[in-house]
């Protein structure tokens, strides 16, 4: 009986340790930001994220609207000196968005340490004639009704594309590509999907 009791205690301890390790992910911080940028002509837009999704659709001819959903990676113990909650708050307060006229970059981390501790999902509306580059390390891409050339790539996510401009290129390392109503020539490439 005593050995069975020891096994029960060990199993309970192992369960407690496993649950404790999962708690940071279960209670991960999350915040959002919302920005609208004015443009006055053809737009060149670059959107990148490490592990989030990217959705791009057409909107107003003179605005780019960006909504970001920032989530912590739960990696506060990796030595950057701050908590995951701090990283999420910093990104939400000062999103990684740069604009130089009609050239807009979204998601470039500019060497910030927080970039390794958060995941950002992007929902973007932009003029239909935008030239777009969208990259995600491991998230899905959904792009529709963009008449400009689109270069979209993801390492391990899927790509859903509809009505893209001629000369577009869609690539995924290990996901699937679902594309329809593409204009002109378009290159589709998948590694293992």
Give the residues covered by each predicted segment:
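Basic polycationic patches enriched in arginine
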Residues: 9-10
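Bacterial N-terminal signal peptides
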Residues: 13-24
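Acidic (Asp/Glu) and glycine-rich low-complexity loops/linkers
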Residues: 2, 6, 26-49, 53-136, ...
């Amino acid at each position: 009986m005593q050995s069975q009791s020891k096994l029960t205690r060990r199993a309970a301890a192992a369960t407690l340790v496993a649950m404790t390790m999962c708690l940071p992910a279960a209670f991960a911080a999350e915040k959002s930001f919302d920005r609208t940028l004015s443009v006055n002509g053809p737009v060149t837009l670059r959107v990148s994220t490490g592990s989030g999704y990217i959705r791009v659709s057409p909107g107003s001819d003179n605005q780019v609207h960006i909504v970001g959903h920032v989530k912590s990676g739960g990696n506060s113990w990796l030595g950057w000196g701050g908590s995951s909650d701090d990283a999420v708050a910093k990104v939400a307060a000062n999103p990684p968005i740069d604009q130089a006229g009609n050239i807009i970059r979204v998601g470039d981390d500019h060497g910030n340490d927080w970039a390794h501790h958060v995941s950002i999902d992007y929902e973007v509306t932009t003029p239909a004639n935008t030239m777009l580059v969208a990259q995600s390390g491991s998230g899905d891409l959904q792009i529709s009704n963009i008449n400009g050339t689109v270069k979209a790539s993801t390492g391990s996510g899927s790509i859903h594309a509809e009505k893209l401009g001629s000369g577009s290129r869609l690539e995924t390392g290990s996901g699937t590509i679902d594309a329809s109503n593409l204009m002109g020539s378009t290159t589709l490439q998948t590694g293992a999907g």
